[in-house]
Amino acid sequence: MSFTFAIIGRPNVGKSTLFNRLVGQKLALVDDTPGVTRDRREGEGRLGDLEFTIIDTAGLDEGAKGSLTARMQQQTETAIELADALMFVFDARAGLTPNDRAFADFARRANKPVVLVANKSEGKAGGIGAMESYALGLGDPVQISAEHGEGLSELYDALRAIMPEPEVEDDDEEIDGLTEEDFSKRPIRVAIVGRPNAGKSTFINRLLGEDRLLTSPEAGTTRDSIAVEVNWKGREFRIFDTAGLRRRSRIEEKLEKLSVADALRAVRFAEVVVLMMDSQNRFEEQDLRIADLIEREGRALVIAVNKWDLVEQQGGQIAQLRADADHWLPQVRGVPIVATSGMLGEGVDRLIDAIQDAYAVWNTRVSTAALNRWFEQAVAQNPPPAVAGRRLKLNYVTQTKARPPSFVVFCSRADAVPESYLRYLVNSLRGVFKLPGTPVRITLREKANPFAHKRKRKS
């Protein structure tokens, strides 16, 4: 069982910077604006030979009951309950504030080991602030600079002192490599994206059965891409809830630009992407832009039309959604569409089934024999057009990879094959081998002519 630390403290003391430093990558947004982190996020931390789970939390701050700030504090309290020990972080340059003192009491009442971290300890002011912290009664402060990586050896000593001795692994249990069965047990990486306030976090909370992610009628509540582990009927998923993606012209605030970049990274890391639309405003321009991005990144796509409980006269609406999707998104024709209600918990089973089906399609490999039978029939049924009086010759096709399914067609003149004919081949292949909603790549390549050098020498 992994040892878990929760990083706590008031807003803007450098908790997310420390989190990023310990996990070794920028998983949490960092900005000078207080309150950047809203949800709690988890990562696998490492410091020297120490390995542990680490939870980054929203800054502990006061807030009216039911407000976004109060719910941020509730997330922090939950993180403290889950943790084995706490890292209480304060800003040594700013010195102790009344909030630091109040929440130091809060940390003490948790009755868990506490590592007092004096962040931003560079310079004389930082040293003075660190000395002040003895008044908190939480032991010796560890003076660090999370931004510059200073003081990490001292932090290592403090963490090592409260962590249990690592268990010695049995040498007989070495893993030589993943089998097909092992691969099938890997968590499917899923990103849930969409415009702001489409209901992404509400839906994931319904899936988890807990208020794991902050939700609010205010658009843009989620700022980071938050990853959660889900076991649904024996299948593991790693689901990323992302910040809403707006049109570039509307992304004005620096912090929102960071959030959008974080969401795009989640899409690139995912295997299946769920594009969540609001049932009251579906297939708007930004939805289509997001779908196009997902296709260009080569990810499997599932469309979830959320807040379906708000739709009046639902009969026939799904058929209309299918027609709209195939019209506006021909590049992923047949994309799975699921009507959901995160608020009521409707459509969860159907969406999970659609994700698993999309993942299977994304991993499709077609046998060479079946592929070439299709190819011969497709070319015979609709031959490529002639160019300058000479018919193009398409020789054969081969699959180069899955994830997404990608193929190479060898032909006489690759640059002369029109885009319309390439689309014909993609749609035909998609229909015959049942590849709905996943990007299908076909690349044209000219077959080497073994007699070309002889002709060249002759002339």
From Swiss-Prot:
The protein in question is named GTPase Der
Oligomeric form and interacting partners = Associates with the 50S ribosomal subunit.
Q: What does this protein do?
A: GTPase that plays an essential role in the late steps of ribosome biogenesis.
Residues recorded as binding GTP 1, renumbered to this chain, are 9-16, 56-60, 119-122
Query: Could you tell me the gene encoding this protein?
Result: der
In this chain, GTP 2 is annotated as bound at 194-201, 241-245, 306-309
Gene Ontology molecular functions: GTP binding
Q: Which HAMAP family match?
A: GTPase_Der
